[in-house]
């Protein structure tokens, strides 16, 4: 028998890495066990740990160092102790302050939130659970040190940097402020993982404990200060502030936040009563079928069904009655639903705002005080600044920050509404307002998110999220839009006339765009399985939008909406006589083929718009929402009730609700089992609704027996109309549009015979040979008729002159298919056009007659018939597909209907002394405009399709887009994390870095002096000489430079030098950061210019407008430009390096005669 091999111990961390990290933990002195005493090498140890975190964990995407530090209890055992020691004793010591700052730098990466994503390695799965639990311990240690005030100590470290004006603030100061805020954000994010075993009390790290700690240690005061001054003094800290606010308020009920103690106690009592009532209801339902002491013997019965089949049902409860037996049979049925692909779940727990969070009364009081102060002072500055940063796509903005922004705006708007509601209740109870609040409050405190820019941003975000199927982002956008609508509704009811006018203007802008209406409808119809939070948001948005739109349309009878559609330019009958070249023609054809957006205003009809919500998909969405009736509150149940009432009784589309599963749901809500609690206020309304629906169902079954079958299926529009009214909907047939006119590619054929052969071959390939034969017969009969007429007319001419012409011949056919083809078949129409057939009249509609004009002689008709017969007999002799040789024909007239010719308008004025007014147009046409337009078309040659013709984006494309956005987010996040180290925080001065800096400066000065000496000896610089030679190529070598060239070249040099700026990085927290000065070295690269042009949006964020260095650079460039201009004007000859020529006695060369062309001055470089 083989011996069992003992299991080997798996090393989760490389032993060498563990030994290196543990060797760094030696910065403390253990002589006194009762007091934490720093060792001499404490600062060096902290610096080494920081290097290991940055160079090992972040560079190799591992978590070994963080795991070792967690096992060694570095945070609670050392870093927090050092910060508390600094707070008590070392605030005046510069050395201790540097050590404390190094501790904060370590706390930020160690507390950075850990997310579970799809690209995790084995190492991540091994370390993340432990590190998540360790971070909870870190947070517990930071919050529990209230006596020492760890958070207050962190704020104290950043206060000196805050006090410095922005123009004098260095990169180190900005870095200190960033790590301070990121540490606060990490503390707000860290929560206990429900999947892991909790160590200690969960209340110590809960949201309530975090809020209380932030209030007690002045974190809320810091946030208020930064938010209210974010646009002026702290413009790079808006995103961390937004994230802190989001993680502080997500999931908290706004209504409970602004309740007083009595209301909160009553609310809590009602919730407890509801839970007890649900429990008693569940017990009653269970007691109906619960086993008794006597029911110890099994029971099995046979049930004979209507189709003479037998079914087996077991259990004594089936003996009670027939209904119970059938219900037991239904419960035993199992539907083998087809399995689909596993749905990709969003595992980012830290950004979930659908899960409700409960906080303690003390935390509620503290948070309410902060929210009120934030609404009064910091709401507008912060959210306006964040919105602008998101619109600019700043490098510091991640994709998740848009979701943070939208949800936080919606939450604070709801808080403002709740605060006003509580104030009104307080005033109603007291009977009068306080003396300091005699005037009603204006909505100016939240006006920063009620402007047109926010609406444009919100609509764009909703549309992008809907197109890319980013459901969480769309959920946040819908919540934001709903709160904006509710806020505007309250503004319209404000006693201030100014607020009423603003609300009227906002509603007009929101409801004016029909695209907004269509988007709301598409969101409601597109629900599948996005979760209850998304379902709640989309149903609430549609309910609020419909209700407000109905009220607004009633008060504004003449309401107009703007509908946008894509339309194509209609073909014009007349064509321009003069045609351009083939290339020009192709470009113009593609230009005319592009679909353009057309805007059209029309009167709004609310009944017509509400009818769009009367379809089966919208009903299914609200049915899915109603299935959660046991968990819904009164407002949500009322929302669903109002929708079904609108469908059944306002829109008269009751048949949409006549489906077995919907009727079963409504019956179960009222009668059970597991029905709605009858004590709820909304129960009576639901009961009456269900009763009326059942009554109408019975009547409808008597009128329409076919409804019995249709109860099993969803109703399409035609079926619903028939079941409702008893007859099919009458549709009015409209005349069809003529097909697009075709033409033969001029490159493929030049003679009429070749064109006819190509068209005949195309018809034959499309199996339309019968049409070609019919046309041949028409030509033959027309030739015979025309020949007889010509002979007869010849005899008449011999007798005497006549004035009559040859009669026209109508193209007729007894076959209806040929008649339809004359209008619908574009190739047949092209063939008749090439044969010089004409249409009677100018209208191109179905049924119009084609004729053979009198100008065509019998010989011409016979020649055309011979060509067609030959092409039909021989077939296609070309290897190319004849269909590829045909193309659409477009009119070359201007699309706006303007003829393009200049009007002979005279703008002469006698007051200006004009005696003779020239004839003709005042401003002749620009002969080069057409060429520019063609070049632009060639560069932007892209055909757009109609929205209805666009194919839906498949899942693979969406997944590729998601992966691209995810990679971009990870790159930005990695940049933020890797830069979260304060530059020069370890030392105020670095001798090695200074020595390297001075050495480089010495080399640059030496190179510059050599270039100056060489320029003085040669009379020019090498680069300038090369440029001058290139510029003067083809000219006489002895021709002197004219003033225009000198001035132009100087301007070009100044322009190129002006773009040579170093963009400051968004996150400047980097070790050993160098800012090379390219201006001093005189080197400039075109790649740098391209990079600068591509990052103009980022440059707006990174450039501090109060930075003296930034303005100093601009002033230096301006002064240099002014000096050059002055020197050029004063000195006759000036070299490129700015030095005057040594030969001052050389006579000045006379200026060249200015060249004139067509009355315009032509400079030397304008060729």
From Swiss-Prot:
Name used for this protein in its record: Topoisomerase 1-associated factor 1
Presence of keyword Glycoprotein: no
A single GO cellular-component term on record: replication fork protection complex
Signal peptide as annotated in the record: none
Compositional bias annotation for Polar residues: 1078-1088
Keywords: Cell cycle, DNA damage, DNA repair, DNA replication inhibitor, Meiosis, Nucleus
Annotated region (Disordered), positions in chain: 332-353, 563-594, 889-969, 981-1093, 1105-1167
Entry superkingdom: Eukaryota
One annotated GO biological process: DNA repair
Pfam families for the chain: TIMELESS (PF04821)
GO-annotated molecular function: DNA binding
Database matches in PANTHER family: PROTEIN TIMELESS HOMOLOG (PTHR22940:SF4), TIMEOUT/TIMELESS-2 (PTHR22940)
Organism whose genome encodes this protein: Emericella nidulans (strain FGSC A4 / ATCC 38163 / CBS 112.46 / NRRL 194 / M139)
Localization per Swiss-Prot or TrEMBL: Nucleus
Compositional bias ranges of the Basic and acidic residues kind: 572-582, 959-969, 996-1013, 1110-1127
Gene, per the UniProt record: tof1
